[in-house]
Design a protein with these regions (language model features):
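An N-terminal assembly and electron-transfer interface module characteristic of large anaerobic redox
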Residues: 1-244
């Protein structure tokens, strides 16, 4: 029995699944995190606000602070779990009372870099970072790569690893792929909450393919600051705008 208990303790400490609890993340955010995870020994789980009493079962509790509305009792539950040793970080808290973090400054900066530059690669490596550096597992660990800056103010296509700073570069790529159609209608796609580099983009890809199959040249734009400049240069025949 003692041997079995020792083996179980060793497994739990060095090899067991890393569990990351998510509090107040929107569905599309959760989907991006989950779909980016490629490690069998890392799991995400959403934590409803009425179940904050079980934060202690997670190896990291990651909360999204924007729009987080909790009662004093719920906030006390989060603080109590942090005091008891559960790693907790409420990211992007807009209410100072919800600015709760039990991570050291370096670990907090690491998590912030991954999630602040949200893309599939960073989300995947954030999960690995949690297992390696916060959960401190020794087995079934894939070393985390450093966070990379997420592409912004760019055009993009079906290959999520590619982005294009100029319309000319994007059209050159389409021609090289045999996709560009001379004198075909131009359709621009802008807006939407889905970051095309977050790993959760099946709906965007489906739209791009459908429009291309219909004989159109498609220009998906991921930009806030230069959106109008891109549209002026593209000169689209129609614009599909995802307001939300």
């Amino acid at each position: 029995l003692a041997v079995v208990l020792c083996c179980w303790a060793a497994w739990s400490k060095w090899a067991s699944t890393t569990r990351i609890g998510l509090v107040n993340f929107q569905n599309y955010q959760t989907a991006s995190l989950v779909k980016s995870n490629e490690d069998n020994f890392i799991e995400y789980e959403e934590i409803p606000l009425d179940r904050l009493d079980r934060l202690g079962r997670y190896d990291l509790v990651l909360g999204f602070g924007m729009g987080l509305k909790i009662t004093e009792e719920q906030r006390a539950q989060i603080l109590a779990a942090a005091d008891e040793g559960t790693p907790i970080y409420i990211y992007a808290a807009t209410n100072p009372e919800n600015d709760i973090c039990s991570l050291d400054s370096l670990t907090k900066a690491g998590i912030s870099a991954y999630i602040g530059n949200g893309n599939k690669r960073n989300y995947r490596n954030m999960a690995r970072y949690v297992r390696q550096h916060i959960d401190a597992k020794r087995l079934f660990v894939t070393p985390a790569e450093e966070a990379v800056e997420s592409a912004s103010d760019v055009l993009y296509h079906l290959d999520e690893d590619l982005s294009f700073k100029t319309v000319a570069d994007y059209e050159k790529y389409l021609r090289e792929q045999g996709i560009y159609r001379e004198k075909a209608p131009k359709i621009a796609i802008v807006g939407g909450l889905n970051d095309p580099f977050s790993g959760n983009r099946a709906n965007i890809d489906s739209l791009i393919v459908s429009l291309q199959n219909a004989g159109m040249n498609v220009y998906p734009v991921s930009s806030y600051r230069q959106r109008l400049a891109f549209l002026r240069e593209i000169g689209p025949d129609a614009v599909i705008h995802f307001a939300h």
